Amino acid sequence: MYIYNVTINVEESIHNQWLQWMKNEHIPAMLKTGKFLNALMSKVNVNEEMGGITYSVQYKTPDQATLKQYYEEDAKKMRAQSKPFEGKFVAFRTELEIVDEQE
């Protein structure tokens, strides 16, 4: 299993609108690609020097091949959906391999 982690720092001026868009539109659209099993959105408890509010969104995917398929088939379109917020956030993405999971 893999996690596609997207960490986003959002300017406070658009925070509420962006958060609603993420929860009601973007994350559901990501799941509808069929490449991810679930999504977990967390607020990062950190005071950024640059300001803003930081979130981590973790999308679980079964394997690296599925994640590669997402990059090839869906990533460009999904990232373009954030155009209304352009210049008001920064994001970086990491791939995590799950080595152990317990409940």
Give the ranges of each region predicted by the language model.
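Short amphipathic alpha-helical segments
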Residues: 15-40, 79-80
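Short N-terminal helix-initiation segments at or just after the protein's N-terminus
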Residues: 1-7, 35-42, 77-86
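A generic structural signal for alpha-helix starts
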Residues: 12-17, 65
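Short, well-ordered beta-strand segments in beta-rich or mixed alpha/beta enzyme
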Residues: 3-9, 42-73
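Glycine-rich beta-strand-turn "strand-cap" elements at beta-sheet edges
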Residues: 40-50, 80-103
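A short, structured loop/turn motif at beta-sheet edges
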Residues: 31-33, 62, 103
